[in-house]
Amino acid sequence: MTLGTAVSVAVALLATAAPADAFAATANTHHAAKKTASASSAKKKSVKAASEKSAKVASADAPRAKASRKRVTLASNVHGHRGAVRKVAFQPRRPTVGQAFGLHDTPDALALRSSVAYVVDQNTGEPLFDKNSHAVVPIASISKLMTSMVVLDSKAPMNEQIEVTDEDRDYEKNTGSRLSVGSVLSREDMLHIALMASENRAAAALSRYYPGGRPAFIAAMNAKAKALGMTDTHFENSTGLSSSNVSSARDLVKMVNAAYQYPMIRQFSTDRTYDVYTGKRNLVYNSTNALIRGNGSWDIGLQKTGFINEAGECLVMQATIHGRPMVMVLLDSFGKYSRFADAARLRNWLDAGGGERLTAANTANGGT
């Protein structure tokens, strides 16, 4: 899949909504239909208020159960019965770009749930596991690694105070944030929670405070990608909420290796928890990575999670396994915890010598 094709498909999927009449209710009389419509209209304000309240606690890496299917409830009077019959249906979630291209159907020896899986020896660059590493797909909040490098490359004062404004709200996906408009944090704190907790408004505010503003920031992201040789990569924003932020696993290895050279990115991305004061209240943020929050059995030097509907569940990280530093990329995984389970399967496979067997087979076949 090429870069241009991936962007086009992502835009098409975003524009295509599930059918509004996925489950139709019937009404026997015009009076019953009017009654139902009237009741629906009367509830509009309360439903809207509840929706806005729910959005405030949502995030790019929030629980997926509510986002996976849209609930549709319709009511009607049947055969003159006084009680309304309520019918409930669920509109299926639109496919990811990977699903649209059939990447989920690619078989692999470990039965991974990720459409894309790529493991590379960080020291030698040798591929140890490869599943669709050339595929160009949306990468969601993995984009924040590039965001962080551009922020640090700017050499802007890390103690400068940055205020969240209405411009930093997400009007594309309507995700919520714990950082309310008017919150003020230092550039360092914004970067910390953008990496560790995938805080979207923090990433958006960082791009707005860049010299030349947001357009200059996005240009710097793409220039950095080009300088790193990331030919399959394109960025449209600093948060990753745009499905037009795309890359391949091979390119993401280059980005992880580059980000690993920044001590602050290594530290911030692997912290388990962090407290900030917004000028209004204290907030406690936690890592979005279950492997970081777990029992400490992983030796992770850098990581970033990501999720939007078009990208599926994503994870990139640098980890040391059996004393061997590796870069692991998992994209378009299906199921909230599947990316972490896939990472565990890959580690177990490597522990059992899977990487060495693959290397030996490649050498015997004259491969690389």
Q: Which role fits each region the language model picked out?
A:
Residues 75-250, 254-263, 321:
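Active-site-adjacent loops and short helices of periplasmic peptidoglycan-processing enzymes
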Residues 2, 174, 186, 213, ...:
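Secondary-structure junction/capping motif
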Residues 12, 133, 156, 314, ...:
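Ubiquitous "structural anchor" signal
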Residues 230, 234, 240, 244-368:
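Domain-terminus/edge residues, biased toward the C-terminal soluble/receptor-binding domains
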